Amino acid sequence: LYLYRDADYGITLAARGTSLGADNGVGLAMMLTLMTTPELLHPPLEFLFTVEEESGLWGARKFDYTQIRARHMINMDSGDADMMCVCSTGAVHNRFHMTYKTVPHRGTVYSGTIGGLLGGHSGNDIAKGRANAISLLGEFLEKLTGCENAWLIDADVQESQGIPDQATVRLCVENGEAEKQLRQLADMLQKSWRSAYRAAGEDNIALRLEQVEEEALVHDCISCEDLRKIGALLQGIPYGVIEYGGKNQSIPFCTGCTSRFCVKENVCQLWFSVRSLSEALKWDTEKSVKELASQLGADVEILDQYPGWPYRTDSPMQELCKKLFQEMYGEEIKIEYGQGGCEPGIIIDKLPDMDALGLAPTSRGAHTTRERFYIE
């Protein structure tokens, strides 16, 4: 990796051309420094190195925890330098599957693109009120059924680790009047979306239409009845904060986010995740989305699930960290309630008496090639 200091964002350290997790990298660096610097004074330490954290916490899941004797843990996959993470969400990842009927229609092909969205981390940014391209697409598809002589051929939203920021569709448009209706719908929705999400900084949401074929040919298009069901599914699946909790009801306790969508060859598929600080709320939400799917004729498959890192009100380690931070910096440390899945949930599920907290340097741009650490 080519490391460099970037002064454009303050004094930061970054790596060129990679989205590898900088938080994982700094955790490795800190542990290796402790292991190879004999002049540092500390009690006996155990170091747990894991693999494939970003792709599914697989290293932590496969580890044999009978090897661990320690019962106090510092995790380094967390927030800013003045912040302590005390818990994190568990999750259920689902795939919805629905078949649909097609009807042949003659017309020219148009492409439609929903873009200009901010996107972001599906955990850390989910409470910021940003738009999700799949949710917007659901509204477009539902209203498309009201356009005469314009039909959906297929649709795609590429897989995203975060909040989807772009969706594409192919449409069959019979004539000029249908094109006019379609463009009016696109203009109306674009204005509506920009207004609805302006407070979240979504000033550039766009719905663009472009003719990609001039010759009118016959295409297999989704039936209006099934298109309504697909639109209802995309809009009915909960997105964003489902329930707040904690002090002053200010902590996102349960959230939902769709991450991938595909309509092709008589099959509609949708990927959706529930994240929750409460196991009971996680499974209650899972039950409700399965009921919605059943009403619309869709099947649901659980692809993966993992437990959260529960919040402890009696953590000696967290109390010690608060005390030391106050003594060192003259201010209270901030508390983070993590919204992205992380390894302590897996570890504490295996070792319930483990007392854990999360500390890390300040970083920005997670899951992007702009990820960087502040070093001054």
Each PLM stretch: what is its role?
Residues 6-54, 110-116, 121-144, 171-172, ...:
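Alpha-helical metal-binding/catalytic segments enriched in His/Glu/Asp
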Residues 12-101, 153, 242-245, 249:
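Acidic/histidine-rich catalytic neighborhood of metal-dependent amide-processing enzymes
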Residues 66, 130-147, 176-179, 225-235, ...:
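His/Asp/Glu-rich mid-to-C-terminal helical/loop segments that flank catalytic regions of hydrolases
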Residues 130-155, 311-354:
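Active-site-adjacent substrate-binding region
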Residues 147-160, 245-262:
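A structural supersecondary motif
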Residues 158, 169-172, 205-220, 257-261, ...:
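A short beta-alpha structural unit
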Residues 161-244:
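A conserved active-site cap/scaffold subdomain adjacent to cofactor or substrate pockets
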Residues 253-255, 259-269, 324, 328-376:
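Zn-dependent metallopeptidase/amidohydrolase metal-coordination segment
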